[in-house]
Swiss-Prot record:
The gene is tad1. It comes from Clostridium botulinum. The keyword Nucleotide-binding applies. This is Thoeris anti-defense 1. Upon ligand binding the C-terminus changes conformation, enclosing the ligand. Belongs to the Tad1 family.
């Protein structure tokens, strides 16, 4: 496991670690999110293990899992909810704009791959 170097350095609630080695395309495919505070037995609570898609979706031996846009859609939904509630802020609005922009670019890649009939394959 390797702890990620995150943008937020102070007052972090959680630690994110990546597990394993690089897969196809050079990315890692499993992450753990755990608490930064120990319980009474000296253990850290693990909140979630996230397993990403590993390999092309049409490959028989690929590991099916979460894709990057799934996580961004969750963050987008949360930021939209904060903006509609009592925690609306300029910072959240800017973050929402950039998350939506990231999703737009990721979708543009998907659409391009669909048009070229290579979505779900290891063809570049």
């Amino acid at each position: 496991m390797k702890e990620l170097s995150t943008i937020q350095k102070r007052e972090k609630l959680n630690t994110v670690e990546r597990i394993g080695s690089e897969g196809p395309g050079g990315a890692y495919h499993e992450y753990v999110i755990k608490s930064n505070s120990m319980d009474s037995q000296g253990n850290y609570d693990v909140y979630e293990t996230i397993k990403f898609q590993k390999g092309a979706r049409k490959e028989e031996k690929s590991q099916h899992g979460v894709i990057d846009s799934d996580l961004l859609e969750i963050v987008r939904d949360r930021l939209k909810s904060f903006q509609a509630g009592p925690f609306s802020s300029r910072e959240n609005a800017c973050a929402l704009t950039h998350v939506e922009e990231a999703l737009m670019w990721m979708n543009r890649r998907v659409e391009d791959r669909i048009e070229r009939n290579v979505l779900g394959t290891n063809t570049k």
